[in-house]
């Protein structure tokens, strides 16, 4: 359950030649579902009394728009950033929600399909939670970084942004030797800031969802230990109680982590 469906084994901690097919497939499918849900809500929008689905989407749109207004004061930029924030929130929420599926449901179906096709079902790996894959979570945060860099250049100009890279946060001086030293220090601090923001943005989402996935696996092991003994029956009952309690609590984590990821994206872009 902790192995990915990938093209090859990783040769290093960071190996950009490794592709996790399951993360890519589920991310794309859920992105398509996000697009469809928002498109369906927009298509059915009318000035009359809204249905429950339309009302829920309108509340969500208004909520995200208000959050964007408090961070991004340029109305023209908000026309892109606010819908982006909405898409991020819905997409990450849907990806996180995959953690509520039974641990063995889709992997067992996939193993049977691979076995029926003549493959080895014991090595038919499949992980359905894209945000519990560090490459998936970091991919999202890197995308936010690229948008942030784009707006830096768009608003400040390439020259203005380059000037900021070597003059902030410690400023500069008219003395050339000191200006060079300050420029190097400022540039290093800017790189550290961008890197730390991107790492913390992605790893926060990954860490919370990966931990939640592990807890679900541990709870599933309790159910797998069922036997007609006092201990086995106790573990099975504990499996049901713990599974229900953690699933209810995890719903809050799913929404909260999507909200935090969206808010940080708006803050970084803003």
Language model regions located:
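Selective transmembrane helix interface/packing segments
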Residues: 1-270
